[in-house]
């Protein structure tokens, strides 16, 4: 992809929309995407125009490249990553046999974080449906304790995996890169209950 912006003072083209938004402090709706087969031409007088130089082919974006490598601050990428996490919920529930009470949800920093939030929203929706079903099964006059037991259920999430930024910087500068690379990620001790989670 390529994105462009023009005003009275500047014309700019970049591979990612958020770079233009941040550098020039402009909103996303003022930035245009260059379409397949188009070229952005600027003459010596500074007049800008788009020209169709090739016949557009079928667009076949690589979903992995788009979701994983794209800048996460782009509004469309953010929505797609959240939706990806939400769409994982049925498979996750199947994998854990719907045992959310003994499951702690987390993510590997950094790219997966946004998908993680989408997954949590999907899990919250699932749990709310379960709560409604359980309350309805109690009948018309449930006790305070019965309601409290059902309503207190939560999706458990922790920041289990962390990135050791200091070690990552050290590895990038040092000669023992291969030996230390496995330790760039660490766990947050105490975030899980051994034998239970």
Which functions belong to the PLM regions below?
Residues 1-195:
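N-terminal segments that mediate ammonia production and transfer
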């Amino acid at each position: 992809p390529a994105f462009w912006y023009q005003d009275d003072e500047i014309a700019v083209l970049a591979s990612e929309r958020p770079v233009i938004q941040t550098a020039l402090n402009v909103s996303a709706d003022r930035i245009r995407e260059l379409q397949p087969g188009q070229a952005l031409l600027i003459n010596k007088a500074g007049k800008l125009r788009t020209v169709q130089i090739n016949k557009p082919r079928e667009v076949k974006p690589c979903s992995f490249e788009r979701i994983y490598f794209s800048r996460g601050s782009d509004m469309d990428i953010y929505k797609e990553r959240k939706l990806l996490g939400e769409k994982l919920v049925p498979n996750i529930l199947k994998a854990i046999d719907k045992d959310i009470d003994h499951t702690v949800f987390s993510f590997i920093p950094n790219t997966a974080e946004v998908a993680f939030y989408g997954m949590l929203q999907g899990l919250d929706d699932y749990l709310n449906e379960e709560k409604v079903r359980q309350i309805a099964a109690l009948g018309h006059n449930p006790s305070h304790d019965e309601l409290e037991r059902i309503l207190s259920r939560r999706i458990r999430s922790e920041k289990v995996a962390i990135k050791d930024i200091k070690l990552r910087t050290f590895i990038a500068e040092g000669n023992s890169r291969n030996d230390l690379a496995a330790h760039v990620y660490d766990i947050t001790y105490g975030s899980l209950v051994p034998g239970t989670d």
